[in-house]
Amino acid sequence: MEIFRNNELIGYNYYFFKTKNDEVHVTNQIKLTVKLLAVTIFEIESFGEEKYNNDKLISFNSTTKQNNKKKFVNLVLDTKNNKFIIKGSSYSGEASTNNVIGNWWNHKLLQAESQISPVSGSIKKQAVTFIAKEKIELYGKSYETEHFKIKSRSGFIDLILL
């Protein structure tokens, strides 16, 4: 998917899905640059892999360069204790399996009370608000969308889903 800010293309966030029997493998690539008056104020490039078995997250790994800082997440499901074990650049420890990886493809993100940052592994409580159904135009085509706002202590994301 393309990422726009003020109707200007600023990057991409691509997802690739592979399924085999009860397993789903999701690969994610993101790159975006935000400029203000021709000065770069935010830049990110990331690669991540999620693995699910029977719709249950069993592992997640990512490497990210954000504003010239290297960040990472290595997460595995401890099936014996039904908890995630996270080693990340901002958090290392255990997490409840009620948490969702904060990637935009997963509609469960909109139903979760907290998310695991796909950049650093930190756990963020969130509040999701449905704003409205909206119609947007891209490249001469009209799309019906749903507009949500996701708030956390670190700010908010204004998210429009096709």
Named regions from a protein language model:
Residues F16-V24, W104-W105, S142, I160-L162:
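Short, surface-exposed loop and linker segments with low hydrophobicity and enrichment for Pro/Ser/Thr
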Residues I3-T79:
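N-terminal mature ectodomain segment of secretory-pathway/periplasmic proteins
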Residues G11, Q126, I157:
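Short beta-strand or tight-loop elements
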Residues N6, N61-S154:
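Solvent-exposed helix/loop surface patches that form functional interfaces
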Residues T27-Q29, E43, E144-L162:
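Gly/Pro-enriched, hydrophobic low-complexity segments
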Residues A38-T40, Y139-G140, L159:
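Short histidine-centered beta-strand/loop micro-motifs
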Residues I3, K51, I136, L161-L162:
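Hydrophobic alpha-helical segments, especially N-terminal targeting/anchoring helices
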